[in-house]
């Protein structure tokens, strides 16, 4: 299981990202718009760079909700492959069946 501080850091990044998403999108739209003057686009670039680094969605890591494992995490179920197998074998995930042929 991951350290609690790492899990909390990721949750903090998720909250910051969701809070500042609209502001980042507005600034990015200004930066990409060719009809706006170069000076205004540069000022938007400066404002974007002054936003917290953790407000970018790239810094969010998909982690297992149960164990906090960063790798092998299924997005659909939000759990790792190990937990998915355990929960699936005892019937805790609806619609998930063991395959046989």
Curated annotation (Swiss-Prot):
Entry protein name: Small ribosomal subunit protein uS14
GO MF annotation terms: rRNA binding; structural constituent of ribosome
One Gene Ontology biological process: translation
Subunit structure comment from the entry: Part of the 30S ribosomal subunit. Contacts proteins S3 and S10.
Short name of one Pfam family: Ribosomal_S14
InterPro entries: Ribosomal_uS14 (IPR001209), Ribosomal_uS14_bac/plastid (IPR023036), Ribosomal_uS14_CS (IPR018271)
PROSITE patterns associated with the record: RIBOSOMAL_S14 (PS00527)
Record has Ribosomal protein as a keyword: yes
Stated family: Belongs to the universal ribosomal protein uS14 family.
The species this protein was found in: Ehrlichia canis (strain Jake)
Function as written in the Swiss-Prot or TrEMBL entry: Binds 16S rRNA, required for the assembly of 30S particles and may also be responsible for determining the conformation of the 16S rRNA at the A site.
Domain of life (superkingdom): Bacteria
Keywords: Ribonucleoprotein, Ribosomal protein, RNA-binding, rRNA-binding
One cellular-component annotation, GO: small ribosomal subunit
GTP-binding keyword on record: no
């Amino acid at each position: 299981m991951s350290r609690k501080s790492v899990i909390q850091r990721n949750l903090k990044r998720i909250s910051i990202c969701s809070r500042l998403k609209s502001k980042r999108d507005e600034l990015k739209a200004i930066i990409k718009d060719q009809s706006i003057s170069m000076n205004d686009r540069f000022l938007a670039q400066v404002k974007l760079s002054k936003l917290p680094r953790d407000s970018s969605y790239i810094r969010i890591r998909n982690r297992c909700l149960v164990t906090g494992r960063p790798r092998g995490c299924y997005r659909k179920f939000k759990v790792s492959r190990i937990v998915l197998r355990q929960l699936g074998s005892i019937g805790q995930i609806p619609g998930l069946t063991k395959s046989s042929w």
